[in-house]
Amino acid sequence: METPIKGRFTKTQLMNIHRFLFEDIYPFAGLIRREQISKGDTMFYPPHLIGQELDKVFAKLHTERMLHETDRKRQIEHLSYIMSELNIIHPFREGNGRSIRELIRCMAIHYGFTLDWSRVDRDTMLNAAVRSVVDDRAFCDVIMACIVEGQRCTEISLNKK
């Protein structure tokens, strides 16, 4: 078991997760991208806006007290919102999906439940990612499908695969 990436759900924590996951693969691990990128018809945020947009997303997470939510349905909606926003920002050149999923998994643990992303297939995840550009609740069904019922997690661990 690796040492967990601790944080308060901030841009820095997301960058640290990315660095941890990809430091042995990419020289740009943990660094915000400086290139304009797209996938298919989806154009992600331009590099000069990434930092401020990430700050806005994480500020909203904290100012609206999303981390204090106790209603499971609202928790899932918050997770979907954060996941959708981070997806369209796409802060890294590569590895956005894995880094974002790990941050969302950590947030779920904060809420008191566990997510197992292997419960949904790649196509389901990609379809939700495409829809999330126009619907910040696009990941709700994916997150629901990934909840491990009856397992309450109190420790965050991050293992490289």
Where are these regions (language model features)?
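FIC/Doc superfamily catalytic core
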Residues: 1-161
